C-alpha cells in the first residue's frame, strides 16, 4: 500500500493563481460561452444558482434559465412546496402548454381570479368534465364585474363561448403566430378531433422566446430547472414528486458526496427507469477518489467543493477541505476520461474566478454569494447606513438547520446531523450574514459573462473547450495578489463588476 505523504499535496485556490495571456485572434463578442452542465444538457451560460434558501426559489430559477443558465431549487422546504416551485418554473414559458390550467362553467370568478394570480396568467380555458373545450374566460371578461360580485358570478355568465379560434396539435410556430395575428387573440387552444382540450399556445410565450433567445429550455420549449434532494428520510419521496412535477435535473446535495448514503441513492435513481429523462448530479466532493466514486455510481455530473463558500465554516470547524482550484483539478482527473462534466461550487468572488475554475477542469460554476444580493433571491432588502443589503446564510448555519414547522429541518441531513435530537446540540458549519444589493440577475450575469469573454480574449479561446485546452496558470505570491487588485488609491466610484 502506497504511503500517504501529508506534505506532498499542495492546495491552491483562486487567489493563488492567474491565467497567462497568449496570442489571440478572438474578440470578446465572438466568444462562445456555452458548456455542458451534464452529459445531456448544454447551457449557453456556464452559470448555476446554488441550492440555498437565500439564493434559489422559483423566481431565481426562472431568471437563471431565461438568461442561459440554470437554477437549482433548495430543499430546505416541504416536498409540496419544492414540487410547486418546479411546476411554476415549467409553466412560466412553453412552446405549447401541455397541461394548461383550466376551469369549469360552475366555478366562480373569485376562483378564476385566484387561479390567475397563483399562476400569473391572464385567463383560462373552460372545459367540461370529459375535457371538452366549451369556452375561455380572461381578464377582459371579468374587468367590469364589481369586486363584491366576484364570489356570486359564475364563469358561464361571462365567458366567451364556443366556437373559438382553435388549432390542432402539431401546428408550427409560423402557423400559430398567423392565427394569433389574424384574429387578434392572445391564447390559442389546441384540440383533438373530438374537441377536447390538448394544449394551449399563448402570444406571451413567443414574445419571451424573442426576448430571451439563449434561454435554457427542454424539448417542449419549457424552461429547464434543477432541484436538490438529500439521501435521508423523505429523499426518495421527494425525488419522485420532483420527477412528477417535471424537474430536469436532480442534485443529490450533501457536504460529503463520497458517503455511502449519497452513492446509494445515486445508484437507485440511475437504476429506476422512471428517472431516465432526468439527469442526476452528485456532490459535493473535493478529491479524485470522491469524484470517481460518484462516477462509478452513475452520475451525469460531479459537483466539487468542500468548504470554499464565503458563508461556510467546514474547513475551520472540521478542519476538512481542499482549496478549490486544486479540488476542481483533482476531480477533473477522474471526470474527464469518463466524459462527465464537473461543476465548481463555491468560492467565486469575481468573474475572473470563473475562467480560473474552467481552466482548472470545471465545465460550469455554481454561484451563491454573487447572486444572493439580486432582486430574484428570496428575502427582503435590508437598509443599513444608507446602503442596501440582502440576507445570505449557509445551509450549515444554525438558522438553516434549526427545526421549523413540524419539528423538521430539511437542511440537517446535508451535514449528516439528521439524528441530532435538539437544536442546541447542532454543530453548525456555516454562518448567517448579508451581502450588498446587486440589482437584477440579468445585470449580474451580463457582467460575469462579460468578464469570462474577456478571459477568453486574453487566452485566445473561442469556446470553453478551447479555454480549457489553452489556459495555463501561473502561481502568484501575496504581493502578486495585492498588485492584481486596485492599490495605492482611494476608490470613489464603484465598478459594477468589482467590490472589495
What function would you assign to each model-found segment?
Residues 29-43, 50-52, 81-121, 126-128, ...:
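Bateman/CBS regulatory modules and CBS-like beta-alpha motifs in cytosolic regions of diverse proteins
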Residues 72-76, 102-103, 123-125, 145, ...:
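Catalytic beta/alpha-barrel core
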Residues 65-70, 244-250, 274-277, 296-301, ...:
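Glycine-enriched alpha-helix->loop->beta-strand junction motifs that scaffold or abut catalytic
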Residues 59-62, 237-245, 286-304, 344, ...:
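Catalytic cores of alpha/beta
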Residues 42-49, 95-100, 162-164, 218-228, ...:
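Short beta-strand/loop segments at the ligand-binding rim of alpha/beta enzyme cores
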Residues 29, 78-87, 145-147, 152, ...:
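Active-site-adjacent beta->alpha loops and helix N-cap segments on the catalytic face
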Residues 4-9, 212, 309-344, 348-500:
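Conserved active-site-proximal phosphate/metal-binding subdomains
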Residues 134-140, 198-202:
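Short hydrophobic beta-strand motif reused across regulatory alpha/beta modules
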